[in-house]
Amino acid sequence: MSILNDLDISKLVETTKNKIKRIYLQDNIPWIIGYSGGKDSTCATQIIIDTLLELKKEKSKLSKKVYIISSDTMVETPMIINTIERTINGINSLAKKNNLPVEASIVRPDYDRGFWANLIGRGYPCPNQTFRWCTDRMKIEPANKFTESVIGEYGEAVMILGVREGESNSRDRVLENHTIEGKDFMRHTTQANSYVFAPIRQFTKDDVWNYLLSNKSPWGGDNEELFKLYSDSLSGEECPIMMSEEDKKKTTCGNSRFGCWVCTVVSEDKSLTGFIRSGITWLKPLLDYRNWLYSIRDDEDKRMKRRANGSIYFCKINKLENGDLVISAKGNRSKNIIKNLNGEWVDSFGTKWNVFVGDKSEEEARDYIVKNNIDLTLGENPKIIIKKVDEEFYQLGLGPFTLETRKEMLTKLLMTQANLEHPHQLIKQEELVEIQKLWKESGDLENSVEKIYKKFYNDDFSISSDDITVFSNDDLKILNDICVEKDFDAKLFMELLNIERDFAGYSSRVEAQRAIKNKLSQEYLALREKGETNEDKYY
């Protein structure tokens, strides 16, 4: 590193610290630092704590409360959550030792809002770019809940974020759009009475690493280890910080991003793959499980053909110039071409499709489903196509994962955890309880979660009968036989039994009757409603 660069970074750091001091001392509005464990949030957190320690030496009065929060989604990359936990503990010890008004904590989603409750419990499709349900529920909501509690106590708050200009064009546009001219703070996008301060906004990536590697972490963290994590996540292609401009175009060393190990928003998890290639081989089963989830997302055999609320919708099918219909390959789903052969529509696998044509095509398709007692909660595709008056063709849209697929997901997850060559816990027992509660609502009365768990673990874990209704296999067979004899939907009957059990002992039947009515509406009445054509509106 040149002397000139040394002077440049020193001047930048000095200017940044002076700005932090001025803003900190000007009022008593509490600060909330968002810490993710990455380089930028680590830099922002460290430079603020370094500045507070300087103010302490300067005998300045430190009366403003500084909160540091980190969102643990409970599916974070293992090495990152370990770093976060050590950092939070280290910061709290430092604050206590130096009498700093700093308090660090980890926030988490409620168990029923977590990844496994939504994916395996409710059957949400794996997150992708168009249906990214995970971020709000698992990361933003817990942080917002904490922020709201601080605002409720103090009236307002300032969020400190490690965002920088030059990270991306979209990030730069966001920063520009929320900047208030002549002010130190930016507008918060969603929360009233809160503002955003970005102390390292003018830092480059090299500035961040220069600061971290030139200044020892005040709470005892290892910034060299952090840099190694970034290097490992990129297959061990470690590179020096100060590179030529040509070198910088060829590598992204030190510019990686960490996320959830189970993330399916990207097609390939380069970070997890990089860790494995760098020698952390016990992560391989996690990558295998993640890749399997990615592969089955659009597998029609593993998805319901209705929404969780019982309604159905139709998705447009692409039509070729010769009139053939084509369902594109996606994930494990093979490409399927449907041809009109002398009035019969037959696909690439020799299967016939039922086609309903005209302005009443949707209504006729719904009637067909009801009359033939087709269970849309199963994976089997009823092979229904409608041709509307616009001359376009549509097929049934996909809904949540089927209950059987969710059982398969849990089985593979617990098998992965049981065979993992590391004590890291992939799913908490509290999450298993939530999954069983949700499965009960889907008609699972066998306590399947506990049964699956016992295949891999011989401990005292059990799900209380207070949380679920448990029937023996003999009970279920008898109930099923009765339903067959009376020509009644066995699955619906089990779900109605669940409702009765939930409201047992209530002095009034009003709520029970409302729940029963809603369930019947889900199963039959919603089928009569007009469907939508957005394939990601599963719920």
Predicted features, each with a name:
Residues 38:
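Conserved G/P- and acidic residue-centered "switch" motifs that form tight phosphate/ATP-binding loops
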